[in-house]
Regions:
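Short amphipathic alpha-helical interface segments enriched in basic and hydrophobic/aromatic residues
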Residues: 20-24, 70, 93, 124, ...
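Secondary-structure edge/capping motif, primarily at the C-terminal ends of alpha-helices
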Residues: 99-102, 127-130, 157-161
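Amphipathic alpha-helical packing segments from all-alpha helical-bundle domains
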Residues: 87, 107-133, 137-151
């Protein structure tokens, strides 16, 4: 991954912020590059220097969230649900604008589904070591139940529980 200079980082940040504001109001397939650029106060050539279209911009935001999620899981004991929820909430706090639009209040979010899929292999591998007598079916079922439960705690309870 190439290092971006400050101007490019700023431009991408403004485009992402503008896109997320529009995404609060309407679905991605109804957002135009012209609208994003008008809100960002940038011209379309600048937009196209960074992204091919609004879907590419959304994919970039989603990938940043996936990367942040992956980093938040690196140092967490996957058996410690409290630590896992705290790590996820920390990631949401650090990426609040994108998470509020793409994840929170949206249990069918594609980002959320990608996060669940990302954590599955490592979680099951960890549990396989911790629970050597568990069958693959048991481990799969355990992951399904825990990931769906965690997903709902995060999506439905973020604002409620983060205040505590």
């Amino acid at each position: 991954m190439e290092k971006l200079d400050a101007r490019k980082r700023y431009t991408q940040m403004v485009l992402k912020q503008s896109f997320l504001k529009l995404l609060k109001e309407k679905p991605v397939n109804r957002i135009t590059v012209k609208e994003v650029c008008a809100l960002a106060q940038l011209n379309r050539a600048t937009f196209y220097a960074h992204y091919s279209d609004c879907f590419a911009l959304m994919e970039s935001i989603e990938n940043e969230l996936i990367d942040a999620f992956e980093k938040s899981l690196r140092y967490v004991n996957l058996f410690d649900v409290t630590a896992l929820i705290e790590a996820i909430y920390d990631m949401v706090d650090q990426n609040q604008a994108a998470c509020r639009v793409l994840i929170l209040g949206n249990t069918s979010s594609t980002v959320l589904m990608r996060m669940i899929a990302l954590a599955k292999e490592d979680s099951i591998a960890y549990w396989r070591k911790e629970l050597p007598n568990a069958s693959e079916t048991d481990l799969e079922m355990m992951y399904t139940h825990l990931s769906n439960g965690l997903m709902h705690v995060v999506v439905e309870g973020y604002d409620k529980y983060s205040e505590d």
